[in-house]
């Protein structure tokens, strides 16, 4: 399991452009999720989800901490089983102003409820928010 349901990656043939909300400072250029296009991304539990994201680093950093959450009853709830070390997905250090592509693959844990929610990925570097994006998601069995 790896980084960003939301950030810079290598092309996956079936990936479609997904509408996303940038909750950072416009670092993210694009997000593509395997099998998804448009406003809502349907994902299935216990099946791999491939994400490709492009972003520009807003800081020099030697570490990246990743947090992926889903909204549940108005609360941001961490999604279990997500790799939190972004340097395992991207080669650190990152250089400010450089464009990166991240290829992230993760199995949606079976404990995640069947729900329409907003999945948010927050990547933090040594000097604060590195990138943040959110995608409307429908989790199904």
Swiss-Prot record:
GO biological process, one term: sterol transport
GO MF entries: sterol binding
TM region(s), chain numbering: none
InterPro entries to which the protein is assigned, alphabetical: Ig_E-set, ML_dom, NPC2-like
Entry's family note: Belongs to the NPC2 family.
Residues bearing attached sugar chains per UniProt: 103
PANTHER family associated with the record: NIEMANN PICK TYPE C2 PROTEIN NPC2-RELATED, NPC INTRACELLULAR CHOLESTEROL TRANSPORTER 2
Gene Ontology cellular-component annotations: extracellular region
Lineage: superkingdom: Eukaryota
Cellular localisation: Secreted
Xref: Pfam families: E1_DerP2_DerF2 (PF02221)
CDD domains: Der-p2_like (cd00918)
Annotated keywords: Allergen, Disulfide bond, Glycoprotein, Secreted, Signal
Entry keyword annotation includes Signal: yes
Disulfide bonds: 23-132, 36-41, 87-92
Designated name of the protein: Mite group 2 allergen Tyr p 2
Organism field: Tyrophagus putrescentiae
Signal peptide (residue range): 1-15
């Amino acid at each position: 399991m790896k980084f960003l349901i939301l950030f810079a990656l290598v092309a996956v043939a079936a990936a479609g452009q997904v509408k996303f909300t940038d909750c950072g400072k416009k670092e993210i250029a694009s997000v593509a999720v395997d099998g998804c296009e448009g406003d809502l991304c349907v994902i299935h539990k216990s099946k791999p989800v491939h994400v490709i994201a492009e972003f520009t680093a807003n800081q020099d950093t030697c570490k990246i901490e990743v947090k992926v959450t889903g909204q549940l009853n108005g609360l941001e709830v961490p999604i279990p089983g997500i790799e939190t070390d972004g340097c395992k997905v991207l080669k650190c250090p990152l250089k400010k102003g450089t464009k990166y592509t991240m290829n992230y693959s993760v199995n949606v844990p079976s404990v995640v409820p069947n729900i329409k929610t907003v999945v948010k990925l927050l990547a933090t570097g040594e000097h604060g928010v590195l990138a943040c994006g959110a995608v409307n998601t429908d989790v199904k069995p």
